């Protein structure tokens, strides 16, 4: 697990299979910082895929809409694209994205993350918590 939010990390715990990668909401607009974020996600995802483990990327829904800065938008949309592409290549691993809102509680986020990690459900999909995306142009 890679999570810098203490409350969410506590809710997620360390148990269970797979990788939960929580995008850094404070990633700067500097390309080097975005690249470092994506490099870390790639390295961890590659290891999970080799082991046949599922992956969930957690991003802020507003980052997918470009509302919180260029760096956060680049990282979130790249993770979404990466999840979709990796799902085509890593057929043994479910790789999905969970988009959360400011008011998404850590318990709800953790429950959805663990559901995606432990189900035979979607692959390469975006699951949104909340409704702030409704009525917007979506990626």
Residue ranges and their predicted role:
Residues 1-102, 108-119:
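Rossmann-like short-chain dehydrogenase/reductase
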Residues 124-139:
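Short C-terminal tail/terminal secondary-structure segment
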């Amino acid at each position: 697990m890679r999570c810098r939010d203490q409350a969410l990390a506590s809710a997620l715990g360390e148990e269970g299979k797979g990788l939960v990668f929580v995008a850094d909401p404070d990633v700067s607009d500097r390309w080097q910082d975005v690249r470092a974020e994506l490099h870390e996600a790639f390295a961890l995802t590659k290891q999970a895929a080799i082991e046949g483990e599922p992956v969930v990327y957690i991003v802020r829904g507003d980052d997918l809409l470009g509302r919180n800065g260029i760096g956060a938008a680049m990282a979130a949309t790249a993770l979404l694209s990466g999840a979709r592409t990796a799902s085509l290549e890593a057929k043994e691993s479910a790789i999905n994205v969970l988009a959360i809102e400011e008011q998404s509680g850590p318990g709800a986020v953790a429950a959805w993350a663990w559901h995606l990690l432990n189900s035979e459900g979607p692959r390469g999909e975006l699951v949104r918590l909340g409704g702030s995306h409704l009525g917007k142009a979506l990626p």
